[in-house]
UniProtKB/Swiss-Prot annotation:
<dbReference type="InterPro" id="IPR001523">
    <property type="entry name" value="Paired_dom"/>
</dbReference>
<dbReference type="GO" id="GO:0072114">
    <property type="term" value="P:pronephros morphogenesis"/>
</dbReference>
<dbReference type="GO" id="GO:0035775">
    <property type="term" value="P:pronephric glomerulus morphogenesis"/>
</dbReference>
<feature type="compositionally biased region" description="Polar residues">
    <location>
        <begin position="146"/>
        <end position="165"/>
    </location>
</feature>
<dbReference type="Pfam" id="PF00292">
    <property type="entry name" value="PAX"/>
</dbReference>
<dbReference type="InterPro" id="IPR043565">
    <property type="entry name" value="PAX_fam"/>
</dbReference>
<dbReference type="GO" id="GO:0060118">
    <property type="term" value="P:vestibular receptor cell development"/>
</dbReference>
<feature type="compositionally biased region" description="Low complexity">
    <location>
        <begin position="169"/>
        <end position="181"/>
    </location>
</feature>
<dbReference type="GO" id="GO:0007423">
    <property type="term" value="P:sensory organ development"/>
</dbReference>
<feature type="region of interest" description="Disordered">
    <location>
        <begin position="221"/>
        <end position="242"/>
    </location>
</feature>
<dbReference type="GO" id="GO:0009880">
    <property type="term" value="P:embryonic pattern specification"/>
</dbReference>
<dbReference type="InterPro" id="IPR036388">
    <property type="entry name" value="WH-like_DNA-bd_sf"/>
</dbReference>
<keyword id="KW-0804">Transcription</keyword>
<dbReference type="GO" id="GO:0043565">
    <property type="term" value="F:sequence-specific DNA binding"/>
</dbReference>
<keyword id="KW-0221">Differentiation</keyword>
<dbReference type="GO" id="GO:0007399">
    <property type="term" value="P:nervous system development"/>
</dbReference>
<dbReference type="GO" id="GO:0060271">
    <property type="term" value="P:cilium assembly"/>
</dbReference>
Amino acid sequence: MDIHCKADPFSAMHLSHIGHGGVNQLGGVFVNGRPLPDVVRQRIVELAHQGVRPCDISRQLRVSHGCVSKILGRYYETGSIKPGVIGGSKPKVATPKVVEKIAEYKRQNPTMFAWEIRDRLLAEGVCDNDTVPSVSSINRIIRTKVQQPFHPSSDGTGTPLSTAGHTIVPSTASPPVSSASNDPVGSYSINGILGIPRSNGEKRKRDDVLWSGNHLDGRKIGYHGSDGSGPNSDSQGSVESLRKHLRADAFTQQQLEALDRVFERPSYPDVFPTSEHIKPEQANEYSLPALNPGLDEVKPSLSTSVSSDLGSSVSQSYPVVTGREMASTTLPGYPPHVPPTGQGSYPTSTLAGMVPGSDFSGNPYSHPQYTTYNEAWRFSNPALLSSPYYYSAASRGSGPPTAATAYDRH
Protein backbone atom coordinates (compact mmCIF):
# COMPACT_ATOMS: atom_id res chain seq x y z
CA MET A 1 0.00 0.00 0.00
CA ASP A 2 1.20 3.46 -0.80
CA ILE A 3 0.72 6.00 1.91
CA HIS A 4 2.66 8.83 0.24
CA CYS A 5 1.11 11.66 -1.70
CA LYS A 6 2.43 12.85 -5.01
CA ALA A 7 4.28 15.77 -3.53
CA ASP A 8 5.90 13.62 -0.86
CA PRO A 9 9.67 13.42 -1.35
CA PHE A 10 9.59 9.90 0.07
CA SER A 11 7.62 8.69 -2.98
CA ALA A 12 10.87 7.86 -4.72
CA MET A 13 11.64 5.29 -2.07
CA HIS A 14 10.57 1.76 -2.95
CA LEU A 15 8.39 -0.31 -0.72
CA SER A 16 11.13 -2.92 -0.54
CA HIS A 17 12.99 -0.60 1.80
CA ILE A 18 10.13 -0.65 4.28
CA GLY A 19 11.34 -3.99 5.53
CA HIS A 20 14.43 -2.23 6.97
CA GLY A 21 12.54 0.72 8.41
CA GLY A 22 9.00 1.72 9.11
CA VAL A 23 6.55 4.54 9.47
CA ASN A 24 7.09 7.19 12.10
CA GLN A 25 4.39 8.78 14.23
CA LEU A 26 3.93 11.56 11.70
CA GLY A 27 3.17 9.11 8.87
CA GLY A 28 6.53 9.46 7.15
CA VAL A 29 8.60 6.55 5.96
CA PHE A 30 12.15 6.15 7.22
CA VAL A 31 14.84 3.62 6.58
CA ASN A 32 16.57 2.38 9.69
CA GLY A 33 20.28 3.30 9.80
CA ARG A 34 20.25 5.38 6.63
CA PRO A 35 20.33 9.21 6.40
CA LEU A 36 17.58 11.32 4.90
CA PRO A 37 17.85 11.99 1.17
CA ASP A 38 19.57 15.21 0.14
CA VAL A 39 16.28 16.45 -1.32
CA VAL A 40 14.63 16.35 2.11
CA ARG A 41 17.63 17.98 3.75
CA GLN A 42 17.61 20.81 1.23
CA ARG A 43 13.89 21.34 1.75
CA ILE A 44 14.36 21.54 5.52
CA VAL A 45 16.99 24.25 5.08
CA GLU A 46 14.83 26.20 2.62
CA LEU A 47 11.85 26.21 4.98
CA ALA A 48 14.10 27.31 7.83
CA HIS A 49 15.33 30.26 5.71
CA GLN A 50 11.71 31.20 5.06
CA GLY A 51 11.14 31.50 8.80
CA VAL A 52 9.17 28.32 9.34
CA ARG A 53 9.55 26.94 12.84
CA PRO A 54 11.26 23.53 13.24
CA CYS A 55 8.07 22.04 14.69
CA ASP A 56 6.08 23.15 11.62
CA ILE A 57 8.80 21.79 9.31
CA SER A 58 8.60 18.47 11.13
CA ARG A 59 4.80 18.23 10.67
CA GLN A 60 4.85 19.42 7.06
CA LEU A 61 7.60 17.08 5.85
CA ARG A 62 6.61 14.31 8.29
CA VAL A 63 10.16 14.07 9.59
CA SER A 64 10.87 13.67 13.28
CA HIS A 65 11.62 16.81 15.23
CA GLY A 66 14.98 15.46 16.40
CA CYS A 67 16.09 14.85 12.84
CA VAL A 68 15.12 18.37 11.78
CA SER A 69 16.92 19.94 14.72
CA LYS A 70 20.07 17.93 14.11
CA ILE A 71 20.21 18.82 10.43
CA LEU A 72 19.63 22.52 11.09
CA GLY A 73 22.17 22.57 13.90
CA ARG A 74 24.85 21.05 11.72
CA TYR A 75 23.98 23.49 8.94
CA TYR A 76 24.26 26.51 11.20
CA GLU A 77 27.59 25.27 12.58
CA THR A 78 29.38 24.07 9.45
CA GLY A 79 27.22 25.34 6.58
CA SER A 80 26.89 21.82 5.17
CA ILE A 81 23.80 19.66 4.77
CA LYS A 82 25.71 16.51 4.02
CA PRO A 83 25.22 13.65 6.43
CA GLY A 84 28.01 12.33 8.56
CA VAL A 85 30.05 9.29 7.70
CA ILE A 86 28.22 6.11 8.66
CA GLY A 87 30.46 3.19 9.42
CA GLY A 88 34.23 3.03 9.16
CA SER A 89 36.65 5.55 10.67
CA LYS A 90 36.75 9.23 10.10
CA PRO A 91 39.33 10.58 7.67
CA LYS A 92 42.62 11.27 9.38
CA VAL A 93 42.98 14.97 10.03
CA ALA A 94 46.32 14.80 11.90
CA THR A 95 48.38 14.72 8.75
CA PRO A 96 52.15 15.36 8.96
CA LYS A 97 51.56 18.86 7.63
CA VAL A 98 49.04 19.65 10.36
CA VAL A 99 51.26 18.16 13.07
CA GLU A 100 54.18 20.25 11.85
CA LYS A 101 52.09 23.41 11.97
CA ILE A 102 50.86 22.62 15.48
CA ALA A 103 54.44 22.03 16.66
CA GLU A 104 55.54 25.30 15.05
CA TYR A 105 52.77 27.22 16.79
CA LYS A 106 53.73 25.71 20.15
CA ARG A 107 57.40 26.60 19.67
CA GLN A 108 56.47 30.18 18.87
CA ASN A 109 54.07 30.45 21.79
CA PRO A 110 54.29 27.62 24.35
CA THR A 111 51.25 28.98 26.25
CA MET A 112 48.99 28.87 23.22
CA PHE A 113 45.68 27.11 23.81
CA ALA A 114 44.29 24.36 21.60
CA TRP A 115 41.33 26.42 20.46
CA GLU A 116 43.71 29.22 19.44
CA ILE A 117 45.71 26.71 17.37
CA ARG A 118 42.49 25.50 15.75
CA ASP A 119 41.45 29.05 14.82
CA ARG A 120 44.90 29.79 13.43
CA LEU A 121 44.83 26.64 11.29
CA LEU A 122 41.55 27.81 9.80
CA ALA A 123 42.76 31.41 9.37
CA GLU A 124 45.95 30.41 7.55
CA GLY A 125 44.13 27.95 5.31
CA VAL A 126 46.00 24.90 6.54
CA CYS A 127 42.67 23.13 7.14
CA ASP A 128 39.06 23.77 6.19
CA ASN A 129 35.94 23.26 8.25
CA ASP A 130 35.77 19.57 7.38
CA THR A 131 39.44 18.69 7.94
CA VAL A 132 40.39 20.86 10.90
CA PRO A 133 41.14 18.76 13.97
CA SER A 134 39.07 19.21 17.08
CA VAL A 135 40.34 20.77 20.29
CA SER A 136 40.73 17.37 21.91
CA SER A 137 42.66 16.09 18.87
CA ILE A 138 45.02 19.06 19.03
CA ASN A 139 45.64 18.46 22.73
CA ARG A 140 46.35 14.79 22.03
CA ILE A 141 48.77 15.72 19.24
CA ILE A 142 50.60 18.15 21.52
CA ARG A 143 50.77 15.60 24.33
CA THR A 144 51.89 12.58 22.30
CA LYS A 145 53.80 13.93 19.32
CA VAL A 146 55.01 17.42 20.12
CA GLN A 147 55.91 17.03 23.80
CA GLN A 148 57.21 13.47 23.89
CA PRO A 149 58.56 12.38 27.28
CA PHE A 150 62.30 12.10 27.80
CA HIS A 151 63.55 8.50 28.05
CA PRO A 152 67.18 8.26 29.21
CA SER A 153 69.25 5.42 27.86
CA SER A 154 70.94 2.74 29.92
CA ASP A 155 74.32 4.51 29.92
CA GLY A 156 72.90 7.45 31.86
CA THR A 157 73.18 10.00 29.04
CA GLY A 158 69.77 10.80 27.58
CA THR A 159 69.06 10.28 23.90
CA PRO A 160 67.44 13.28 22.21
CA LEU A 161 64.01 12.52 20.83
CA SER A 162 62.89 14.27 17.70
CA THR A 163 59.76 14.51 15.65
CA ALA A 164 59.03 16.23 12.41
CA GLY A 165 60.54 19.67 12.92
CA HIS A 166 60.62 19.33 16.70
CA THR A 167 63.56 18.25 18.84
CA ILE A 168 63.74 17.84 22.58
CA VAL A 169 67.16 18.44 24.07
CA PRO A 170 67.77 16.39 27.23
CA SER A 171 69.04 18.05 30.35
CA THR A 172 72.52 17.40 31.70
CA ALA A 173 72.69 14.23 33.73
CA SER A 174 73.53 14.77 37.37
CA PRO A 175 76.85 13.28 38.53
CA PRO A 176 76.56 10.15 40.62
CA VAL A 177 77.09 10.43 44.33
CA SER A 178 80.57 9.22 45.17
CA SER A 179 79.86 8.21 48.73
CA ALA A 180 76.85 6.04 47.95
CA SER A 181 78.86 2.94 47.13
CA ASN A 182 81.56 3.49 49.73
CA ASP A 183 79.38 4.07 52.77
CA PRO A 184 75.94 2.49 52.57
CA VAL A 185 74.91 3.96 55.91
CA GLY A 186 76.18 7.46 55.21
CA SER A 187 74.56 7.51 51.78
CA TYR A 188 71.20 8.16 53.42
CA SER A 189 72.47 11.20 55.31
CA ILE A 190 72.39 14.74 54.00
CA ASN A 191 76.11 14.70 53.28
CA GLY A 192 75.75 11.38 51.48
CA ILE A 193 72.88 12.60 49.33
CA LEU A 194 74.65 15.85 48.46
CA GLY A 195 77.97 14.11 47.90
CA ILE A 196 79.81 16.12 50.54
CA PRO A 197 82.99 14.35 51.68
CA ARG A 198 83.02 13.19 55.25
CA SER A 199 85.09 15.18 57.73
CA ASN A 200 87.91 13.63 59.72
CA GLY A 201 86.64 11.52 62.58
CA GLU A 202 89.44 12.63 64.91
CA LYS A 203 87.97 16.12 65.05
CA ARG A 204 84.72 14.79 66.44
CA LYS A 205 86.28 13.05 69.43
CA ARG A 206 85.53 14.42 72.86
CA ASP A 207 87.18 14.09 76.21
CA ASP A 208 86.51 11.08 78.33
CA VAL A 209 84.21 13.08 80.60
CA LEU A 210 82.25 16.07 79.24
CA TRP A 211 79.98 17.89 81.63
CA SER A 212 76.92 19.37 79.98
CA GLY A 213 76.50 22.11 82.61
CA ASN A 214 77.71 23.54 85.87
CA HIS A 215 74.64 22.50 87.85
CA LEU A 216 74.11 19.37 89.89
CA ASP A 217 70.52 18.61 90.78
CA GLY A 218 71.23 15.28 92.45
CA ARG A 219 69.32 13.28 89.87
CA LYS A 220 71.17 13.59 86.59
CA ILE A 221 74.68 14.47 85.50
CA GLY A 222 75.23 15.14 81.80
CA TYR A 223 78.35 13.50 80.47
CA HIS A 224 79.48 11.50 77.48
CA GLY A 225 82.02 8.74 77.76
CA SER A 226 84.54 7.96 75.10
CA ASP A 227 83.20 4.46 74.65
CA GLY A 228 79.71 5.81 73.96
CA SER A 229 78.22 4.07 76.99
CA GLY A 230 76.57 5.80 79.90
CA PRO A 231 74.48 4.83 82.90
CA ASN A 232 70.91 3.98 82.18
CA SER A 233 67.91 5.58 83.82
CA ASP A 234 67.93 3.06 86.67
CA SER A 235 71.47 3.87 87.80
CA GLN A 236 71.48 7.64 87.37
CA GLY A 237 70.70 8.27 91.02
CA SER A 238 73.30 5.85 92.28
CA VAL A 239 76.55 7.29 93.50
CA GLU A 240 78.45 4.08 92.94
CA SER A 241 77.47 3.85 89.27
CA LEU A 242 78.47 7.45 88.75
CA ARG A 243 81.85 6.89 90.32
CA LYS A 244 82.55 4.08 87.89
CA HIS A 245 82.27 6.51 84.99
CA LEU A 246 84.27 9.29 86.61
CA ARG A 247 88.01 9.26 86.17
CA ALA A 248 90.17 9.08 89.27
CA ASP A 249 92.28 12.06 88.22
CA ALA A 250 89.33 14.27 87.26
CA PHE A 251 88.29 15.05 90.86
CA THR A 252 90.07 15.06 94.16
CA GLN A 253 88.89 13.09 97.15
CA GLN A 254 87.43 16.19 98.77
CA GLN A 255 85.49 17.02 95.61
CA LEU A 256 84.10 13.52 95.46
CA GLU A 257 82.98 13.73 99.06
CA ALA A 258 81.31 17.07 98.34
CA LEU A 259 79.50 15.51 95.42
CA ASP A 260 78.37 12.65 97.63
CA ARG A 261 76.88 15.08 100.10
CA VAL A 262 75.05 16.88 97.32
CA PHE A 263 73.62 13.62 95.99
CA GLU A 264 72.51 12.46 99.41
CA ARG A 265 70.66 15.68 100.06
CA PRO A 266 66.96 15.54 98.99
CA SER A 267 66.11 17.15 95.69
CA TYR A 268 63.30 19.27 97.13
CA PRO A 269 64.32 21.04 100.38
CA ASP A 270 61.80 22.09 102.99
CA VAL A 271 59.98 25.40 102.79
CA PHE A 272 61.74 26.69 105.89
CA PRO A 273 65.53 26.59 105.58
CA THR A 274 67.28 24.36 108.04
CA SER A 275 70.38 25.11 110.03
CA GLU A 276 72.61 22.91 107.89
CA HIS A 277 72.52 25.43 105.05
CA ILE A 278 73.82 28.26 107.28
CA LYS A 279 77.32 28.37 108.64
CA PRO A 280 77.76 28.86 112.41
CA GLU A 281 79.30 32.30 112.00
CA GLN A 282 76.43 33.36 109.72
CA ALA A 283 73.86 32.13 112.25
CA ASN A 284 75.41 34.28 114.99
CA GLU A 285 75.60 37.29 112.71
CA TYR A 286 71.95 37.22 111.60
CA SER A 287 70.32 36.04 114.83
CA LEU A 288 67.51 38.08 116.39
CA PRO A 289 69.43 39.11 119.57
CA ALA A 290 72.25 40.44 117.41
CA LEU A 291 69.84 42.50 115.30
CA ASN A 292 67.90 44.07 118.21
CA PRO A 293 70.55 46.70 119.15
CA GLY A 294 70.66 47.90 115.58
CA LEU A 295 66.89 48.14 115.45
CA ASP A 296 66.80 50.14 118.68
CA GLU A 297 69.22 52.65 117.20
CA VAL A 298 67.23 53.02 113.99
CA LYS A 299 63.84 53.50 115.68
CA PRO A 300 64.36 56.94 117.35
CA SER A 301 66.07 58.48 114.37
CA LEU A 302 63.45 57.15 111.98
CA SER A 303 60.53 58.39 114.10
CA THR A 304 61.96 61.87 114.66
CA SER A 305 62.95 62.43 111.04
CA VAL A 306 59.64 61.28 109.63
CA SER A 307 57.55 63.23 112.13
CA SER A 308 59.52 66.42 111.54
CA ASP A 309 59.13 66.14 107.78
CA LEU A 310 55.47 65.20 107.63
CA GLY A 311 54.04 67.37 110.41
CA SER A 312 51.20 66.62 112.72
CA SER A 313 48.27 66.98 110.27
CA VAL A 314 47.87 63.27 109.56
CA SER A 315 44.45 61.82 110.39
CA GLN A 316 45.36 58.13 110.43
CA SER A 317 48.89 56.89 110.89
CA TYR A 318 50.77 53.60 110.95
CA PRO A 319 54.28 53.90 112.43
CA VAL A 320 57.13 51.56 111.77
CA VAL A 321 57.32 48.77 114.33
CA THR A 322 60.61 47.14 115.14
CA GLY A 323 61.17 43.45 115.03
CA ARG A 324 61.15 43.03 118.80
CA GLU A 325 57.80 44.80 119.30
CA MET A 326 56.20 43.03 116.36
CA ALA A 327 57.36 39.71 117.67
CA SER A 328 55.61 40.43 120.98
CA THR A 329 52.47 41.75 119.29
CA THR A 330 50.58 38.64 118.30
CA LEU A 331 47.07 38.58 116.90
CA PRO A 332 44.77 35.82 118.14
CA GLY A 333 44.66 32.92 115.76
CA TYR A 334 47.87 33.85 113.94
CA PRO A 335 51.45 32.62 114.47
CA PRO A 336 53.98 35.02 115.97
CA HIS A 337 55.59 37.30 113.44
CA VAL A 338 59.27 36.70 112.76
CA PRO A 339 60.94 39.66 111.09
CA PRO A 340 62.96 38.88 107.98
CA THR A 341 66.70 39.14 107.95
CA GLY A 342 67.95 42.68 107.69
CA GLN A 343 64.78 44.49 108.89
CA GLY A 344 65.50 47.98 110.08
CA SER A 345 68.62 48.32 107.95
CA TYR A 346 67.00 50.72 105.44
CA PRO A 347 67.96 54.40 105.82
CA THR A 348 65.34 56.97 106.69
CA SER A 349 65.45 58.68 103.29
CA THR A 350 64.79 55.41 101.51
CA LEU A 351 61.71 54.59 103.60
CA ALA A 352 60.33 58.09 103.16
CA GLY A 353 60.58 57.73 99.39
CA MET A 354 59.03 54.27 99.31
CA VAL A 355 55.87 54.94 101.39
CA PRO A 356 53.57 58.00 101.07
CA GLY A 357 53.69 60.58 103.83
CA SER A 358 50.16 59.91 105.05
CA ASP A 359 51.15 56.40 106.11
CA PHE A 360 53.83 57.31 108.68
CA SER A 361 53.63 59.01 112.03
CA GLY A 362 55.20 58.79 115.44
CA ASN A 363 51.94 57.90 117.20
CA PRO A 364 51.78 54.56 118.95
CA TYR A 365 50.42 51.57 117.07
CA SER A 366 47.12 50.95 118.86
CA HIS A 367 43.93 49.47 117.49
CA PRO A 368 41.53 48.45 120.24
CA GLN A 369 39.23 46.62 117.88
CA TYR A 370 41.93 44.02 117.26
CA THR A 371 42.42 43.11 120.93
CA THR A 372 39.77 40.41 120.95
CA TYR A 373 38.74 37.93 118.31
CA ASN A 374 35.11 38.87 117.73
CA GLU A 375 32.81 40.16 115.01
CA ALA A 376 34.25 43.65 115.35
CA TRP A 377 37.71 42.31 114.58
CA ARG A 378 36.43 40.48 111.52
CA PHE A 379 34.41 43.42 110.18
CA SER A 380 36.12 46.70 110.98
CA ASN A 381 33.65 48.79 108.98
CA PRO A 382 30.61 49.65 111.20
CA ALA A 383 28.48 50.25 108.13
CA LEU A 384 28.84 46.62 107.17
CA LEU A 385 28.04 45.47 110.72
CA SER A 386 24.75 47.36 110.73
CA SER A 387 23.65 45.81 107.45
CA PRO A 388 20.74 43.35 107.85
CA TYR A 389 22.46 40.84 105.56
CA TYR A 390 25.04 39.87 108.18
CA TYR A 391 22.65 39.10 111.03
CA SER A 392 19.67 36.83 111.32
CA ALA A 393 16.24 37.87 112.57
CA ALA A 394 16.85 36.27 115.98
CA SER A 395 19.94 38.36 116.71
CA ARG A 396 18.19 41.61 115.82
CA GLY A 397 15.33 40.95 118.23
CA SER A 398 11.64 41.45 117.69
CA GLY A 399 10.64 44.19 115.37
CA PRO A 400 8.50 44.98 112.41
CA PRO A 401 9.08 42.63 109.49
CA THR A 402 11.18 44.11 106.78
CA ALA A 403 12.36 43.04 103.38
CA ALA A 404 15.60 41.81 104.92
CA THR A 405 13.68 39.62 107.38
CA ALA A 406 11.74 38.06 104.57
CA TYR A 407 14.96 37.53 102.76
CA ASP A 408 16.48 35.71 105.77
CA ARG A 409 13.49 33.44 106.18
CA HIS A 410 13.71 32.31 102.60
